Amino acid sequence: MARKGNPISVRLDLNRSSDSSWFSYYYGKSVYQDVNLRSYFGSIRPPTRLTFGFRLGRCIILHFPKRTFIHFFLPRRPRRLKRREKSRPVKEKGRWGAFGKVGPIGCLHSSDGTEEERNEVRGRGAGKRVESIRLDDREKQNEIRIWPKKKQGYGYHDRSPSIKKNLSKSLRVSGAFKHPKYAGIENDIAFLIENDDSFRKTNLFKFFFPKKSRSDRPTSHLLKRTLPAVRPSLNYSVMQYLLNTKNKIHFDPVVVLNHFVAPGVAEPSTMGGANAQGRSLDKRIASCIAFFVENSTSEKKCLAEAKKRVTHFIRQANDLRFAGTTKTTISLFPFFGATFFFPRDGVGVYNNLFFEDAREQLLGQLRRKCWNLMGKDKVMELIEKFIDLNRIGELIRGIEMMIEIILRNRRIPYGYNYYLNEVKKMRSLLYNRTNTNTLIESVKIKSVYQSASPIAQDISFQPRNKTRSFRSIFSKIVKDIPLVMKKGVEGIRICCSGRLEGAEIARTECGKYGKTSRNVFNQKIDYAPAEVSTRYGISGVKVWISYSKKKKGRAISETYEI
């Protein structure tokens, strides 16, 4: 007897949210675990009036034999609109003008029921933050609880059985998503930073919320209610919690960055003549190479620690390169899309055909300058330190990145050092609260309109504003869709249901652009629903994006390869 199924769900592969019963019929245990996990993480720290917290958005859970990866979107709150009966808000003028105008600083929604908490949302303000959680039970002796036994101030309740047991025991092999194309994910994420410095608790949010952007609300209430989002032009923050304790090592990449990016030696622009500029640049490169190697090889006892330090430094340099330019020249993350953002270590950063030529030029320049500036003996002495650790490639990648930044006359944007320090404080806060090592990285999304999930969540914020109609929202999205048509997107269909614009009778409005066939089995379609609570009730949003076979278009949420 043939099984009846939803045609859309058959085409969605992993994205089966439209037909959950079909999935649970075959994977009942996995569905139970997934719902249990999502309920647990959603109850850990909900936002309240006096404490910051987070709400879970779209959630994707991947099970592997010895670990489980949880990827979910955390919607950010855009800049507040003006209050009724109040003067209009002060225009934000932060110290981060050099970072470019990407968008307002966002924060998470609070569960408070006041009018201020339900302020309407403006179009481009709604962003996304991608959070990934890794649960690993490889080492039983290192298994720990996510939260300490002391529950003061966490604000979660005991509705999930996972709280009472070690997570590793409840996350054993389910095999729900076991597929050959996911086999590389473990290797891609194996580089994760496992070291962290212990800091004392400090005021974390002053940097993320300047005084001018706090309107006239009490500062303490705003800071306690919100979780900091990423500064402008660093659109997204990736957090990874490693739920197994590791030995920590002390390495400060901020010091290294300050040394080789800041003008330690005389800048070429301050010297007269080409020869003087060349000598100044040579001295600076030589000084930076020696300083970098000394910092990354001192107090080393094993290869693993050396690799951690260099990898940590490379990530910070990537962050700097990201912040210093509005147009990136290399791919910083292999998973192109809005769901997975895991930059690999030095090798993964340069696995881009577009960057191969530049990479070879830098390597050649590195060899010439090292031999000519520092002398054969000095170069060999530095290289031997890494040869002893059997990892000369790490040295090459680190120095190569330094030369790239120096030769392009990069400057640290004003306030960037402050940003790095605040990121470290944020990691420290999370480390102290969860007793787990935490990784925070800043990445960007190149094309949001290739995936249905970010569009659906972005639209779900906008109907809160009574003045925004469905037509205006749809027309704004349609303007950007042609930009991704060349990448394989054929069309988009959007439907909104509910009391739109406060109408007394609920209705459904739909719009489409391009080809969006939902009745063809072999059509590649990405689908995502979303809900939004307004003062007039709950409204729903559905988004379909169709992809071309000839251009090999594909949904971002289903992309796991470079």
Swiss-Prot record:
It comes from Petunia hybrida. Belongs to the universal ribosomal protein uS3 family. It is found in: Mitochondrion. Pfam families: Ribosomal_S3_C (PF00189). GO terms for biological process: translation. Keywords: Mitochondrion, Ribonucleoprotein, Ribosomal protein. Gene3D superfamilies: Ribosomal protein S3, C-terminal domain (3.30.1140.32). The gene is YRPS3. GO terms for molecular function: RNA binding; structural constituent of ribosome. This is Small ribosomal subunit protein uS3m. InterPro entries: KH_sf_prok-type (IPR009019), Ribosomal_S3_C_sf (IPR036419), Ribosomal_uS3_C (IPR001351), Ribosomal_uS3_CS (IPR018280), Ribosomal_uS3m_plant (IPR044954). SUPFAM superfamilies: Prokaryotic type KH domain (KH-domain type II), Ribosomal protein S3 C-terminal domain. Its main location: mitochondrion.
